[in-house]
Amino acid sequence: MMSQPAKVLLLYAHPESQDSVANRVLLKPATQLSNVTAHDLYAHYPDFFIDIPREQALLREHEVIVFQRPLYTYSCPALLKEWLDRVLSRGFASGPGGNQLAGKYWRSVITTGEPESAYRYDALNRYPMSDVLRPFELAAGMCRMHWLSPIIIYWARRQSAQELASHARAYGDWLANPLSPGGR
């Protein structure tokens, strides 16, 4: 008997989703998978008033949490930052009694506006992407979650339709079975 694939909560955070061809292409396979709940934060919370109990319930129901977003000023879009600060609260995700996410998996899926070569100590952005993402890795650790290597689509707006389709296929394959031996 085959085991069921892990339940994935895909938190999508892009304030200008209609303008992001890359993110729309990446998101498409997720909407076709029964084990994935795609949750567009900007569509649900345009006023930034986050339903914290609802979001925490969604987190409890899933084993893998994916944060799909563009890189904004070396961080994340404002609503996702608000979501992280409010939903991953002390007593729920960290601190005394805060073990609701312990043992779950965190993966960042990020699009950038610059090439990979711009993310080096001697390049334009002065730091590699691993340094830029360190606060998110620390947040995963604070929640006692397993940090999975991020998926990064560099220079997303310059990717050809074929390249984006290839990234989307690989992403969809991973989402379909994220905890398989080759998926982590």
Swiss-Prot record:
Topology of the protein relative to the lipid bilayer: Peripheral membrane protein
Catalytic activity: a quinone + NADH + H(+) = a quinol + NAD(+); a quinone + NADPH + H(+) = a quinol + NADP(+)
Protein's cellular compartments: Cell inner membrane
Name this protein carries in UniProt: Glutathione-regulated potassium-efflux system ancillary protein KefG
Any one Gene Ontology BP term: potassium ion transport
UniProt GO MF annotations: electron transfer activity; FMN binding; NADH:ubiquinone reductase (non-electrogenic) activity; NADPH dehydrogenase (quinone) activity
Native organism: Shigella dysenteriae serotype 1 (strain Sd197)
NCBIfam families with a match to the protein in the record: PRK04930.1
